Amino acid sequence: MTMTPEQAAWFQGTFQRLVDNVDRAVQGKREIVSLVLASMLAEGHVLLEDAPGTGKTSLAKALAATVQGTSTRIQFTPDLLPSDVTGVTIYDQQQHRFEFHKGPIFASIVLADEINRASPKTQSALLEVMEESRVTVDGVTHETGRPFLVIATQNPIEQAGTYKLPEAQLDRFLIKTSIGYPDISVTESILAGASDRNPSAGLSAIITTSAVADMADLGASVHVEPAVLRYVAEIAEATREDSAIRLGVSVRGAIAMIRIAKVWAASQGRHFVLPDDIKALARPVWQHRLLLDAEAEFAGTSSDAVIARVLDAVAAPQARAAA
């Protein structure tokens, strides 16, 4: 069943109410909030590359409060074990049986802070749960539930003692973006309310977690014209053929684009995807999936520059609205 224009209008209104609510706690970052919310509704995960103190924890808590969900924060360190993330089976002496104690990964919104400080083994455990939305221990499967959003963070400045995420694992994040510092006027407003140590505490839930799951299902029903599908495939192919790129956009990356483009279109009140949606999302969806060759890196070429070049080179179709 394809989304109707009436459903698209409802989706847009609800989406904007969610953004407005989160924006009360994370001021001046509506575009980033919209991207993260769209990722959650597309049932993907987010990688934030930011310096400390830019509001990552506030974003996670505010988003959880807005959808009446739970939130956890995992501080990744070199000695963190996979079981510290997923949970552990413990023998209950009174009940005379083994019981699974869920780890912090079982929450609606999980902030995986400084993911690149954990060992590759622990990183892999997290990324496996992100991919499967479940944990299997001793042959028993435990579902994470819906919604399930991991917001992983990396500090772009301090690299000592870190383990770089391999390209195959970076590919599992739906988007990569940065909150960044607020402008002066927003900073002034934040300072005026600095006595409020938990800005998300006063937020009211806009919808329930079950309603979020329904929105995700509705977003997936947005129509995509064959011409737009081909446009995405041509862009992905162009990144793989670019002389500056050693590793271009994979098929997984192209699928990721379609998933979030559907939600993005619905958030704009449309029941169909336009080429402009692809252009608007190209940087956050694809920048972390491109691996530059050594010569291009030495010359100062960035993945953003390659994406811009490819978008200019690939002709966008004249997409028609769905009937």
Q: Could you describe each region identified by the protein language model?
A:
Residues 92-97, 118, 122, 130-222, ...:
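Canonical AAA+ ATPase core
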Residues 1-2, 9, 241-323:
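C-terminal engagement/docking regions of AAA+ P-loop ATPases
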Residues 66-94:
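AAA+/P-loop NTPase substrate/partner-engagement loops
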Residues 51, 85, 153:
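P-loop (Walker A) phosphate-binding loop of NTP-binding proteins
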Residues 34-38, 91-111, 140:
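Conserved alpha-helical scaffold flanking the Walker A/P-loop in AAA+ ATPase domains
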Residues 40-77:
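Walker A/P-loop
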Residues 8-51:
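Pre-Walker A (pre-P-loop) alpha-helix and adjacent loop at the N terminus of AAA/AAA+ ATPase modules
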Residues 50, 113-114, 125:
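Walker B catalytic acidic pair
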